Regions:
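N-terminal presequence-like segments and the immediate start of the first folded domain
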Residues: 1-164, 169-301, 305-359
């Protein structure tokens, strides 16, 4: 069976209850006949102390639930707009050709999948000390841990296919330094140690109301010439890594551009999976409907004939939810869609959408 048929993405939701009850309700919905690779919870803690205590509770529940087969675990502080708590699940229907190993490094669980197509790394939930350190120090700490995991498993940094970056108060400044710019500088330092001749990863850089810096990633080293990664550009948009300095805000006068592609695909023989980066359209003075329409046009350009399997929608204002949901229903996608309240990386952006498509 092709990798594209074995990898699955789904979204589960639950109504408002206590945090523990919501987690239990979500875990009860998970598929029993698949290997769970990644669990990403999206919720709304009251402050960073509660965020940390809930993250610890989550980890304890997941360890008890999965034992030695602990998937990657992330807790993202983004208020869900269509649920009390949202769970995004990446799972895999393994066959006799697949070898899956569950490991931990520094307390962080990660998963390695090996088969005839190559080796695949699923890692994440990587975070620093949210309570005691600032964004710059947390960013450096997260990339250091990422490097350690990748070195340990023999994955070069330039084989990252998809990266999710959650940045507390992304457009806020600490003195002259913007949080997003501090993160971009740390990412550029980490990425600068290698050559990216096959393009940067697909990525999302999105605001979180709490939680400091949190990073998830997928990486791949291919074993057959018929399996490979391809960076995808959109002729309608400027490549993010080619932004001018004026787009970003100085962090100690060092302005590294965001290092990501608009999308990246993995091809397996005649099939492919497309990871769509966080996509938005920088239109000043237009409403949500126009931004959403152009964003979906951009996504259509990126995926070609591939079919969307899942979307995440980030909205700048809670009040946009009903309009966004109705507009997307008009596309008749019939796929899982999650809606979160989150700051997008530039003030004029009202909506950002990311997703996964398969052809």
């Amino acid at each position: 069976m092709n990798y594209c048929d074995k990898i699955h993405y789904n979204i589960y939701t639950t109504g408002l209850a206590t945090f523990g009850e919501m987690v239990d309700a979500l875990l009860a919905q998970l598929p029993q006949d698949e290997q769970i690779l990644r669990l990403a919870f999206f919720g709304m803690p009251n402050d960073n102390e509660q965020y940390v205590s809930r993250r610890i509770m989550l980890r304890e529940k997941i360890r008890k639930f999965y034992g030695n087969h602990e998937p990657v675990l992330s807790y993202v502080s983004q208020p869900p707009l269509n649920a009390g708590l949202i769970l995004e699940v990446h799972s895999y229907k393994a066959d006799e050709d697949d070898h899956i190993t569950f490991r931990r490094h520094g307390g962080f669980p990660y998963v390695v999948l090996e088969n005839a197509d190559g080796r695949f790394l699923f890692a994440g939930g990587l975070h620093g000390d949210v309570i005691n350190f600032g964004i710059q120090q947390q960013s450096a700490e997260v990339f250091h841990m990422m490097g350690e995991v990748m070195r340990r498993e023999g994955f070069p940094v330039n084989c990252i296919i998809r990266q999710w970056n959650y940045i507390e108060q992304i457009t806020r400044f600490d003195g002259p330094d913007q949080h997003y710019q501090m993160f971009n500088n740390a990412r550029a330092d980490f990425y600068g140690k290698t050559d990216w001749s096959n393009g940067y990863p697909a990525a999302t850089g999105i605001g979180a109301n709490l939680g400091g810096i949190l990073v998830d990633l997928d990486a791949a080293v291919f074993a057959r010439s018929e399996c490979y990664a391809t960076p995808i550009d959109n002729k309608l948009q400027i490549a993010a890594h080619a932004y001018s300095d004026q787009v970003l805000e100085a962090a100690q006068q060092k302005k590294a551009t965001p290092k990501f592609e608009r999308a990246k695909s993995m091809t397996f023989d005649d099939r492919r999976i497309v990871y769509i980066s966080g996509t938005a359209e920088s239109l000043v003075g237009v409403g949500l409907g126009r931004q959403l329409h152009i964003t979906m046009e951009n996504i259509g350009q990126l995926i070609g004939k591939a079919k969307l399997k899942m979307l995440r929608v980030y909205l700048k204002e809670k009040s946009f939810y009903e309009e966004a949901r109705e507009l997307l229903e008009g596309y008749n996608l019939n796929i899982p869609i999650s809606y979160m309240w989150a700051d997008v990386c530039r003030d004029e952006l009202l909506i950002e959408i990311e997703g996964i498509a398969i052809e």
